Curated annotation (Swiss-Prot):
It is found in: Cytoplasm. Its main location: cytoplasm. Homodimer. This is Isopentenyl-diphosphate Delta-isomerase. Mn(2+) binds at H25, H32, H69, E114, E116. PANTHER family: ISOPENTENYL-DIPHOSPHATE DELTA-ISOMERASE. Catalyzes the 1,3-allylic rearrangement of the homoallylic substrate isopentenyl (IPP) to its highly electrophilic allylic isomer, dimethylallyl diphosphate (DMAPP). It comes from Escherichia coli O1:K1 / APEC. Keywords: Cytoplasm, Isomerase, Isoprene biosynthesis, Magnesium, Manganese, Metal-binding.
Length: 182
């Protein structure tokens, strides 16, 4: 995969430039555009992934299915599809927006900051996973209700963005719709 960049944003969310992704994530990370996606299988189960230990921010942490950064000229939905192929080796249904105005700032134990405008999506797949070990070290298909109970009981065991997304009432409602079999 070619070098990725983040799209830098001003306080109003207007693009101001780009920066190489690895260089962008520091103790003083500038506000930038990202996305987060929750992926469900044909049984209505959620894919929870554990970030590879080589990840700069939150290595080894359990999180939602896939996250990333749209590239210049790429829609958020196109970016979700691209990252699902790259990280998980799967084709997905068109991503659906479940929390369009999510924005957060969090600092990991190593001092790396995430500072993102991060629309949240959900999608389905019927493909078999082909995990990219550079991105994901472990994964589990889980019942959404069990994951939400785990987040409520032990939020420290999950990425902060996953916790913040999952504790939003409207996002929970929209995620629950993906557990219904089609």
């Amino acid at each position: 995969m070619q070098t990725e960049h983040v799209i830098l944003l001003n306080a109003q969310g207007v693009p101001t430039g780009t920066l190489e992704k690895y260089a962008a994530h520091t103790a003083d990370t500038l506000l930038h555009l990202a996305f987060s996606s929750w992926l469900f299988n044909a049984k209505g189960q959620l894919l929870v992934t554990r970030r590879a230990l080589s990840k700069k921010a939150w290595p080894g942490v359990w999180t939602n299915s896939v996250c990333g950064h749209p590239q210049l000229g790429e829609s958020n939905e196109e970016a979700v599809i691209r990252r699902c192929r790259y990280e998980l080796g799967v084709e997905i249904t068109p991503p659906e927006s479940i929390y369009p105005d999510f924005r957060y700032r969090a600092t990991d134990p190593n001092g790396i900051v995430e500072n993102e405008v991060c629309p949240v999506f959900a999608a389905r797949t019927t493909s078999a996973l082909q995990i990219n070990d550079d991105e994901v070290m472990d994964y589990q298909w889980c019942d959404l209700a069990a994951v939400l109970r785990g987040i409520d009981a032990t939020p420290w065991a999950f990425s902060p963005w996953m916790v913040m997304q999952a504790t939003n009432r409207e996002a929970r409602k929209r995620l629950s719709a993906f557990t219904q079999l089609k």
